[in-house]
């Protein structure tokens, strides 16, 4: 691909992402499916803007590489050792059982046994990029099902090595390709990478950080990620596995958060590129000529993997409420299938359209996962949000919740405990299924699901409640929920958490006057204590705190019309000077009034 063509492709990718992803999110089908549909639209079987899919697909695998590096940063070696049973137990069982079942089914459709074995192994793998992205979206990272899912994905990355080595053996060309000397050299090189990374990475980054130049630190981080990926690729191993190991080696270093910050923007863009490339690779010609075969194969693939994963989760002791999440998120085929099937095709293991059929099956199975997870969410919502007992009656006056609390993280838990301590009837809405299980044990009335769904709010008693407290982590979710409540439940008193001044402006513009900036009150309290340590009388420090709170809120309201204006920054500076002048003037009037306490407003 020439330079101008590469630039044009980049512009097309960005345009497709900007156009498709917001639309997909608005339709409620998720960003991942939006990327896939965008890829179909601009690919060779869509509008035909881009035809060199293989080259772009190979480049876009860097998105998975960056993602695995960040995941490695979140896992220290001791944590990885704790996962050994799930990695080599559940992970190995999933690959072997799924591969055996799928290979047997492929043999029934006129695949040779060699091609069926390769096909079964390739289909048994899941998409690391899609599964990890969905697990993050569903907040499964810290749950039991999320940890187990990650273990399975990690074993699949490890299984890449023997799977690729198996292809020439099945093709009957082992003598030409199976060189024990080369294998020994690769093992030594891999061990050398581990030892070198263990003892050299931290001193190198310490030296780079001492320069104080942020751009150099970012460049060094990119060099580490791309270099380790290239090194592993040269050894014939998984690039993602190499960067994951590099991340683990730096997980306990003092540079962990800085490394993650430097990599995160690249990871997001390249992951989007990967999903677009997968959409582009969908062969609509094969789909059209073999429609029935492909549809049946996608259904069978997803069903077999869900069955195997669900049974393994049950044997492993995963909670029943989390088994379907675990099975659903790993039910698709994966990006490794593209590599394995291409290698097998070069060894002439496949006949006719067999490779194309398998690749179409993998691509379509990846497209079903976001939709499948939405169905799983609805099923879990019915399971958790139905009557707790069969003879439970509809709401009566004494059972109606007075307050609905959306989100039960650390912020929401404090509010919930305060309300419960004062005998208030509350209902909690939470998207983290592990938190739902835990809160139910403590006697909270908790509903699982997305609070931006009107039906869930009704089920939770929004029509009978007096107030709703919104403590979402994401500002977009907060504003969407405010809009829904104002439209469908206008009687509710809306109270919201604002993560900062910008979100506070947005809430005020939306008509929400009861909100709390999560760091503002605690910062004011610490400031009051600081004034006391500097010799100010406690009563005077309290008044200073109250005046500052009142005047800051006034300035916040005055700046609402300028929230999106280009002169906002200069006006904010003027407001700060006015605030200081008014504050000093009013405090001088209060200096001799050292007794009495005002109330917070």
UniProtKB/Swiss-Prot annotation:
What PROSITE patterns would the database entry show? RCK_N (PS51201)
One molecular function GO term is: glutathione-regulated potassium exporter activity
For this protein, the parts annotated as crossing the membrane are 4-24, 29-49, 55-75, 87-107, 115-135, 152-172, 177-197, 207-227, 230-250, 268-288, 291-311, 324-344, 356-376
Annotated Gene Ontology cellular component terms? plasma membrane
Instruction: Outline the subunit composition.
Output: Interacts with the regulatory subunit KefG.
The subcellular localization recorded is: Cell inner membrane
Output one GO BP term: proton transmembrane transport
Q: Name one Pfam family in it.
A: Na_H_Exchanger
**Record InterPro entries:** Cation/H_exchanger_TM, K/H_exchanger, K_H_efflux_KefB, Na+/solute_symporter_sf, NAD(P)-bd_dom_sf, RCK_N
As for membrane topology, the entry says: Multi-pass membrane protein
- Protein name, entry field: Glutathione-regulated potassium-efflux system protein KefB
Upper taxonomic classification of the species?
A: Bacteria, Pseudomonadati, Pseudomonadota, Gammaproteobacteria, Enterobacterales
Q: Which domain of life is it from?
A: Bacteria
UniProt family annotation:
Belongs to the monovalent cation:proton antiporter 2 (CPA2) transporter (TC 2.A.37) family. KefB subfamily.
